[in-house]
């Protein structure tokens, strides 16, 4: 008997229960995938209304050995000091200064990053440095860098929804579709996924917008509309950790693919309301960034 034949009715109940819980799927709806080594055709359980996935690091970590070029890093001449470290050590809080000498960057990308580096170094601190600082979506893969606030998941036979606590932003991964021929660019693009090895969700994303402040990291690394992102979300054997290995390809921006990783831990907390526009202050003076408003509708 197939997995869906065995659990299809339960999953249909999940879709109903998920709606009752403000879009967060009840853990009881999914069979215990990790009581023993998962079968290759089983589905990992990421979803619950009672727990989320949280990470406490703001930047990408190195990928597994042999995965290729790692993430873009800081200029070692200007070490980054975050708010927590600044408060603890009484150092001046700084903004990330990117290593624009990294040979993986195309000339235009290095020049754009260097321009923002110089704005920071010259003291022009009022500029917003990421989409998130203006309460915009983080995009793909940048949305994965949200620290300290968990994301939650809904799983159905046709889709996986990733719901961030901040602004309750929703990213949809379609499990039964193929990529469209002409994808309209958007913040989260078009994400097509499938399961592998009983513990991994593989997500392939194209059609990502190049709007201002849409970066792949917190070092203000830009991208073109040719950006192609593949994420492999693997749940730990104890079901208490979640690791993503991310591969970024963009032949107009990078001379080779980038690889990076991110790890979350299970937190037994329900989703709460977090409204970004109430908290959109800058690093230095607690000045509020303006919330952007469109001059005309885009629909």
PLM feature segments, named:
Residues 1-14:
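N-terminal secretory signal peptides that target proteins for export/translocation
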Residues 2, 25, 36-37:
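Basic, alpha-helical terminal appendages of large translation-related enzymes
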């Amino acid at each position: 008997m197939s997995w869906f034949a065995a659990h299809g009715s339960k999953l249909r109940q999940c879709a109903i229960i998920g709606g009752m819980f403000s879009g967060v799927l009840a853990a009881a709806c999914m069979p215990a995938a990790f009581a023993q080594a998962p079968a290759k055709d089983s589905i990992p359980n990421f979803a619950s209304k009672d727990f989320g996935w949280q990470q406490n690091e703001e930047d990408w970590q190195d990928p597994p050995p042999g995965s290729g070029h790692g993430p873009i890093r800081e200029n070692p001449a200007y070490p980054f000091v975050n708010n927590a470290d600044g408060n603890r050590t009484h150092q001046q809080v700084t903004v990330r200064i990117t290593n624009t000498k990294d040979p993986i960057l195309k000339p235009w990308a290095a020049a754009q990053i260097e321009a923002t580096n110089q704005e920071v170094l010259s003291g022009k601190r009022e500029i917003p440095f990421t989409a998130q600082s203006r309460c915009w979506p983080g995009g793909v893969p940048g949305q994965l860098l949200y620290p300290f606030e968990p994301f939650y998941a809904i799983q159905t036979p046709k889709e996986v929804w990733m719901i961030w606590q901040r602004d309750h932003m929703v990213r949809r991964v379609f499990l039964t579709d193929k990529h469209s021929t002409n994808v309209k660019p958007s913040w989260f693009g078009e994400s097509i996924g499938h399961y592998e090895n009983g513990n991994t969700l593989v997500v392939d994303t194209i059609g990502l917008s190049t709007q201002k402040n849409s970066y792949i990291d917190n070092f203000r690394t830009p991208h073109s509309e040719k950006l192609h992102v593949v994420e492999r979300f693997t749940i730990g054997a104890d079901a208490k950790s979640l690791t993503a290995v991310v591969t970024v390809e963009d032949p107009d921006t990078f001379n080779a693919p980038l690889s990076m990783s991110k790890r979350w831990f299970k937190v037994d907390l329900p989703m709460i309301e977090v409204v970004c526009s109430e908290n959109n202050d800058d690093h230095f003076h607690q000045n509020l960034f303006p919330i952007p408003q469109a001059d005309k509708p885009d629909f």
